[in-house]
Swiss-Prot record:
<comment type="similarity">
    <text>Belongs to the neurotoxin 12 (Hwtx-2) family. 02 (Hwtx-2) subfamily.</text>
</comment>
<keyword id="KW-0800">Toxin</keyword>
<dbReference type="Pfam" id="PF08089">
    <property type="entry name" value="Toxin_20"/>
</dbReference>
<keyword id="KW-0629">Postsynaptic neurotoxin</keyword>
<keyword id="KW-0528">Neurotoxin</keyword>
<keyword id="KW-0964">Secreted</keyword>
<dbReference type="GO" id="GO:0035792">
    <property type="term" value="C:host cell postsynaptic membrane"/>
</dbReference>
<feature type="disulfide bond">
    <location>
        <begin position="56"/>
        <end position="77"/>
    </location>
</feature>
<feature type="disulfide bond">
    <location>
        <begin position="52"/>
        <end position="66"/>
    </location>
</feature>
<comment type="function">
    <text>Lethal neurotoxin that blocks neuromuscular transmission. Acts cooperatively to potentiate the activity of huwentoxin-I. This toxin is active against insects.</text>
</comment>
<feature type="disulfide bond">
    <location>
        <begin position="71"/>
        <end position="82"/>
    </location>
</feature>
<protein>
    <recommendedName>
        <fullName>U1-theraphotoxin-Hs1a</fullName>
    </recommendedName>
</protein>
<dbReference type="GO" id="GO:0090729">
    <property type="term" value="F:toxin activity"/>
</dbReference>
<keyword id="KW-1015">Disulfide bond</keyword>
<feature type="signal peptide">
    <location>
        <begin position="1"/>
        <end position="22"/>
    </location>
</feature>
<feature type="propeptide">
    <location>
        <begin position="23"/>
        <end position="48"/>
    </location>
</feature>
<dbReference type="GO" id="GO:0005576">
    <property type="term" value="C:extracellular region"/>
</dbReference>
Length: 85
C-alpha cells in the first residue's frame, strides 16, 4: 500500500514538473517566432533598456563609472544604455 502511494505521488510530482517545463519552453518559443510583431519586439527592447539603465544608475558611486550589469539576450550595458552586441 505504501509503495503504491509513493509511486503515485512520485508520478504526480514528475507530471507537474514536466508540465511546468513544457509551458516555459512554449513561452520561449513564442517569443522567438520569426513572425513576431514589431510592437512586441519594441516592448522587449524597451524593457531591457530600462532595466540596464536603472541598474547602472543604482550602482553608480560618485564620479566612478557605473558597473556594467550583463544584459541578457545579446545585449550589453554601455553608456548607461543597453546596446545590441
Amino acid at each position: 500500500m505504501k509503495v503504491t502511494l509513493i509511486a503515485i505521488l512520485t508520478c504526480a510530482a514528475v507530471l507537474v514538473l514536466h508540465t511546468t517545463a513544457a509551458e516555459e519552453l512554449e513561452a520561449e518559443s513564442q517569443l522567438m517566432e520569426v513572425g513576431m510583431p514589431d510592437t512586441e519586439l519594441a516592448a522587449v527592447d524597451e524593457e531591457r533598456l530600462f532595466e540596464c539603465s536603472f541598474s547602472c544608475e543604482i550602482e553608480k558611486e560618485g564620479d566612478k563609472p557605473c558597473k556594467k550589469k550583463k544584459c541578457k539576450g545579446g545585449w550589453k550595458c554601455k553608456f548607461n544604455m543597453c546596446v545590441k552586441v
